[in-house]
Design a protein with these regions (language model features):
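An anionic, turn-rich surface loop/hairpin at beta-sheet edges
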Residues: 112-128
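Bacterial N-terminal signal peptides that target proteins for export
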Residues: 1-9
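N-terminal small/polar-rich segments of proteins
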Residues: 22-94, 124-164
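Short acidic/polar mixed-charge low-complexity motifs
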Residues: 81, 109-110
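Repetitive helical segments and hydrophobic/amphipathic motifs
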Residues: 12-13
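Short, surface-exposed beta-strand/strand-loop-strand elements in extracellular ectodomains
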Residues: 96-109
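N-terminal signal peptide c-region/cleavage motif recognized by signal peptidases
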Residues: 18-20
Length: 164
């Protein structure tokens, strides 16, 4: 009986040690996920999520003598009125005491701190694709490593004269 228990205990120990060995060579990964599902009646979403999720390079190009531009598209819809947009702060790139002012065009309209219509009632009633362009103002730029943020706000504005 003692031999049976000893053999069984030895086999159990062997099985457990091989499990531990297997676990020591295990790899685990976590992937962060996010999702946004807009309402069917109002949305303003980039066609390429990298536009808003990754840094956009506006570096100076010696071959052209200009800063790179940021270009992209947004799908826009408001089935009950127009879409207005504004900037949350003055758009600029900053490097220490130096700054480069930026121009932000959405649907070919320059955005400011004051909300303005960027997509009309008839265009926004169906999925409308609006271009975005961010460019540097001026032609002379001081050397440096610049960073900045362009923060835009989009509002669903009810139709003039009531609902549809």
């Amino acid at each position: 009986m003692f031999k049976k228990i000893a053999i069984t205990a030895s086999l159990a120990a062997l099985a457990l040690s091989s499990s531990v060995t297997f676990a020591a060579s295990e790899a685990r990964h976590s992937i962060s996920l996010i999702a946004h599902v807009p309402t069917n009646g109002f949305y303003v979403v980039p066609t390429d999520s990298d536009l808003v999720n990754k840094d956009q390079d506006m570096s100076f190009q010696p071959s052209t003598g200009k800063m790179r531009e940021v270009n992209g598209f947004f799908d826009v819809r408001n089935n009950n009125g127009s879409v207005h947009a504004s900037l949350e702060s003055v758009p600029k790139l900053i490097s220490g005491a130096e700054a480069i002012d930026l121009q932000v065009l959405f649907n070919n309209k320059e955005l400011t701190l004051t909300p303005q219509m960027v997509v009309g009632e008839s265009e926004s009633d169906v999925n409308y694709r609006a271009p975005l362009k961010i460019s540097a103002k001026g032609t002379t730029f001081q050397p440096g490593d610049y960073t900045g943020v362009v923060a835009m706000t989009f509002d669903a504005v009810p139709p003039i004269g009531g609902g549809k």
